[in-house]
UniProtKB/Swiss-Prot annotation:
Binding site for [4Fe-4S] cluster: C560, C563, C568
Role description: Catalyzes the synthesis of the hydroxymethylpyrimidine phosphate (HMP-P) moiety of thiamine from aminoimidazole ribotide (AIR) in a radical S-adenosyl-L-methionine (SAM)-dependent reaction.
Gene3D superfamilies hit by this protein: 6.10.250.620, Radical SAM ThiC family, central domain
Reactions catalysed, as given in the entry: 5-amino-1-(5-phospho-beta-D-ribosyl)imidazole + S-adenosyl-L-methionine = 4-amino-2-methyl-5-(phosphooxymethyl)pyrimidine + CO + 5'-deoxyadenosine + formate + L-methionine + 3 H(+)
Gene: thiC
Enzyme Commission code(s) on record: 4.1.99.17
Organism, as annotated: Porphyromonas gingivalis (strain ATCC 33277 / DSM 20709 / CIP 103683 / JCM 12257 / NCTC 11834 / 2561)
This protein's name: Phosphomethylpyrimidine synthase
NCBIfam families tied to this protein: PRK09284.1, PRK13352.1, thiC
Pathway assigned to this chain's UniProt record: Cofactor biosynthesis; thiamine diphosphate biosynthesis
A single GO BP: thiamine diphosphate biosynthetic process
Residues that coordinate or bind Zn(2+): H416, H480
Length: 587
């Protein structure tokens, strides 16, 4: 294997900090502190500005005290918490036949992660999920971790500014997130805390309507391109820019080994679509897919540490004819595979028929289920059609079954939806799926943006995030065109962080408003470096500014290259404010 080359170190003007727990003092919750410079007053005196603390997904890679070693993996911060609960055990070996086969294949030695765990954990009594604990009234360390993380130390600055209330549209956003609130939201099924007991490296996070809107980044190799090194680098790159979870959608060579490297080096939850690997195991022949191979794949991936599975269980055989009226048919890869299988075998899919057994497997490892939208609309013409809604209603039925087994559940959504149909989509989901968190791909609000689909989808993502979606799956500018590269991942993640942030502002999250408030203050005071550092992409902000005003002195200037020295409105504001203040004093 080639040597890994990942980007490390803090973003400009930032430093990693850790906040300790109260209920569980051993917790060290990571955050990013953006250092603010002083305001220079008219009389030349300095006024201190509060530093801004923001949510941080980058893991130890931005901690200057951490020595990165991808061959060792990131720290297993949850291992002792899991051990202390006493409800799991170490298996004697891998339960998956395929996992054992890969482990014993000497030809894979050079590709294999060196420290593979050959004795994964499983629940002693069949269930070790955060949903089960929450329903028992238990507050776990993961729940307090999440509460601290969501608050971002906002209490330290809350009295210094006037927060906008926002319009939460039915969401319930408390002034302060408590561990008990986290527990209650999970218990009600309105939020999930994806945390496979075999992924102790993951830093707990939460996905739910009443929390900050999260984003997911898709990575993964294809039969045509990419390597293990490239996919690990993409994963680390995505979390550096703010991906809350990462889905490995690999369909090329060495899927098992690629996933192991990603999980062991990931501080965020990892999701997959197990059906993809199952299809690879039968050499792409849909007709040969069966429950036994799929079941083995679920166990294989659960024992590696995958935190959530996209499973297309809601696509029923009788739904398939509804797609014949569509302009673009079935565009979901998983959906098209299931539809093909159902049509060939003239029966319900093995996934639907064995759904309860799937839930029992997932409960053993605390793998959350993301109920896939195999019938999502692939164009504006097909939005909110009969096929999409029929599947969505089935997903609601499956949600109740998953909850019966204490399996954490989220619902996947579209797709391509014009702006005037987005709110209706959200309302149907909330009712049909009993308030379970919604996880949407965009939606794209137009079909004509090839090369710019990260923008057309972010428009829809910001709206549906405001209306109630809990997590947004990013879309890159390569959507519909090709496999995204490293820079496409960055562009997609930052674009979706913006969409999520816009939704948080609209819903009235105080932490979102504080960052905007401080950015506006820095902008009016011509504190250029603070503006750069508060940006979602500080490096690009610096690059754009310095392209026309590169000298260090220009970072103190009271103008930029857009308006120049004589046409800067903020500079003019300062001048007439000074005059008005002087007149007021003289009177």
């Amino acid at each position: 294997m080639k040597e890994f080359k990942v980007t490390t170190g803090p973003l400009p003007g930032s430093e990693k900090i850790y906040v300790e727990g109260e209920r569980f003092p051993f917790l060290r919750v990571p955050m990013r502190r953006i250092r603010m410079s002083d305001t220079i007053l008219e009389n030349g005196e300095r006024e201190k500005n509060e530093d801004v603390v923001v949510y941080d997904t980058s893991g130890p890679y931005t901690d200057t005290s951490y020595e990165v070693n991808l061959h060792r993996g990131v720290p297993k911060i949850r291992e002792q918490w899991i051990e202390d609960r006493g409800d799991t055990l170490r298996l004697e070996g891998l339960s998956s036949e395929y996992g054992r086969m890969r482990q014993s294949d000497a030809s894979l030695e050079e590709l294999r992660y060196e420290h593979v765990c050959t004795r994964p954990r499983a629940a002693k009594d069949g269930c070790a999920t955060q949903l089960y604990y929450a329903r028992q009234g238990i507050v776990t360390p993961e729940m307090e971790f999440v509460a601290i993380r969501e608050n971002q130390l906002i209490d330290q600055v809350r009295t210094r500014y006037r927060a906008e209330e926002g319009e939460p549209l039915g969401a319930v956003i408390p002034r302060k997130i408590t561990p008990e609130f986290v527990r209650d939201e999970i218990a009600a099924g309105r939020a999930i805390l994806p945390a496979n007991i075999n992924h102790p490296e993951s830093e707990p996070m939460i996905i739910g309507r009443n929390f900050l809107v999260k984003i997911n980044a898709n990575i993964g190799n294809s039969p045509i391109s990419s390597t293990i090194e490239e996919e690990v680098e993409k994963a680390v790159w995505a979390i550096r820019w703010g991906a809350d979870t990462v889905m490995d959608l690999s369909t090329g060579d060495h899927i098992h080994e690629t996933r192991e490297w990603i999980i062991r080096n990931s501080p965020v939850p990892i999701g997959t679509v197990p059906l993809y690997q199952t299809l690879e195991k039968v050499q792409g022949d849909v007709t040969k897919l069966n429950w036994e191979i799929f079941r083995d794949t679920l166990i294989e991936q659960a024992e590696q540490g995958v935190d959530y599975f996209t499973i297309h269980a809601g696509l029923r055989w009788h739904h398939v004819p509804l797609t014949l009226r569509r302009l673009t048919g079935i565009v979901s890869r998983g959906g098209s595979i299931i539809a093909n299988w159902c049509t060939t075998h003239k029966r319900e899919s093995f996934i639907y028929e064995h759904f309860e057994e799937i839930c029992r497997i997932l409960a053993h490892y605390d793998v959350a289920i993301s109920l896939g939208d195999g019938l999502r609309p692939g164009c504006i013409h097909d939005a909110n059609d009969a096929a999409q809604i029929a599947e969505l209603k089935t997903l609601g039925e499956l949600t109740e079954i998953a909850w019966k087994y204490n399996v954490q559940t989220i619902i996947e959504g579209p797709g391509h939806v014009p702006m005037h149909k987005i709110r209706e989509n959200m309302e149907i989901q909330l009712e049909a799926c009993h308030g379970a968190p919604f996880y949407t791909l965009g939606p794209l609000v137009s079909d004509v943006a090839s090369g710019y689909d990260h923008i057309t989808s972010a428009i829809g993502a910001a709206q549906i995030g405001w209306f109630g979606t809990a997590m947004l799956c990013y879309v890159t500018q390569k959507e519909h065109l090709g496999l995204p590269n490293r820079e496409d991942v960055r562009e997609g993640v930052v674009t979706y962080k913006l969409a999520a942030h816009a939704a948080d502002l609209a819903k009235g999250h105080p932490t979102a408003y504080w960052r905007d408030y401080m950015m506006s203050k820095a902008r009016f005071e011509f504190r250029w470096k603070d503006q750069f550092h508060l940006s979602l992409d500080p490096e690009k902000a610096i690059q754009f500014h310095d392209a026309t005003l590169p000298d260090e002195g220009h970072k103190e200037a009271h103008f930029c290259s857009m308006c120049g020295e004589h046409f800067c409105s903020m500079r003019a504001n300062k001048n007439f404010r000074k005059l008005l203040n002087e007149e007021a004093v003289s009177k």
